Amino acid sequence: MENKFPGKDISEKDLASKIPLSSSKNKKKIVKISKDTSFGGDLIPIIAGRNTVENESILFKCCESMEKNNLKLLRAGIYKPLTFPYRSKNYFELGDKGWRIIEKVKKNFDVMIVSEIMEESKISIMNNYVDIYQIGARNMQNYPLIVKVAKTKKPILLKRHFGASIRDLLGSAEYALLQKNEKIILCERGVAAPHTHKATSRFLLDLQAVPALHEYSCLPVVVDPSHACFWHKWVHNLTLASLAVGANGLMIEMHPDPRNAAVDPLQAINLDEFTKLVNQLRIISETLNKTIV
């Protein structure tokens, strides 16, 4: 263990030979999304919205909330990887038709789109609308997909799989960086552990992963507390904690009527709760010499 970092599975040899591009031995990267939005510096972007776009009305209301809070990064999932193949009677996947809604959103609001890609064949259509590609937890080690998306040269939000180590996550990031795409953002979204309080929480939010990734890697780190805890009433405190431990960005699920959401009704916060949370984040960020955007 003398060649290992304390308590983790990354060695000095790993930094040099297995993850040389994502290693902390390199200069810390700032991933610029637009003139006023970037990850890894003094700005803390908030990615908020829906992991699944249900209809135009709901997404427009989310955009109005974003506008009210002076935020730019809208989460808008068109393709949804559900754990089971069965859908509720309230939900149907819009599929490629969903991009028509995104087109209207971009015409009516000053937002940038963050959306998950699940298969290579969707790159051609998504490239027309997406500002940040999300590689979801289930595809974290889908290396052919990561390579193809990296070749678009667009920013990638790479989510850590709930059973993956930090070493695994950085290995996946290395595939993208090897394509000369340096716009890689890591995302902690909770890990599965047999001893966690399964009755009250879906996953365990690994807050320790944030300072650990900062120590081992040069890449910015976003935290998604919504998908980790799965309970809306805990999202607020876990988001504040994520900022406190050094998150370079935050991902928050919101909905105008969460309890009637077609997908994941338990984890989204309503628009008033979202505004309250953003206001508190701004106060805390000032003490850290950071700015919420």
Residue map of PLM features:
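Alpha-helix-loop-beta-strand connector modules within alpha/beta enzyme cores
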Residues: K89-S115, K148-P155, L207-V221, Q267-K290
